[in-house]
Amino acid sequence: SEEVLQPVDHEYYVMQSEFYHEPPETDDNGRPSRQLEFSYPNGLSEEPQLVVFNGREGALTTAHPLKAKTGETVRVFFGNAGPNLTSSFHVIGSCFRKAYRDGDVLSPPGRFISTVSVPPGSATIVEMRMVVPGTYTLVDHAIFRLDKGAVGFLNVSGKPRPDIYGSAAPPSPCVGCKLHA
């Protein structure tokens, strides 16, 4: 039998979800509790306190980024657990050579797509060929969700490709920025 999806070098699973909670309680020493209480009013008004990838803020950033090498193909199975917000999944610095919207692997994929809309309870499958080394940033392109935790990194190693991309200034971190490693 013929495989529906062709083999790739790396496959990753990324799930976006949002959390609605009350402000954390504090203990006698003024430290906030790590246990949060669900907020029905915040959920009803669709105002999440957190929008995250893989269950928590920072799950796919500096400590646990996705990884690949130049010349490799990466497939991301991206889901949106919701419960309320539609995700505009985007990888800064790349485009999706193939995008299987709604996880539909029987229809031809979209080609060279920049951003994929994923409603709550749905999924998509995207593929990227990594050409230039660097840190690629996974975001919900409703960009202010970045400050609520919807950010991850794909670190690509390999030989520089100044014929494709170069910068006069060396990379340097932005103070307080969540967009870069």
Where in this protein do the model-derived segments appear?
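Copper-binding active sites and cupredoxin-like electron-transfer domains
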Residues: 1-181
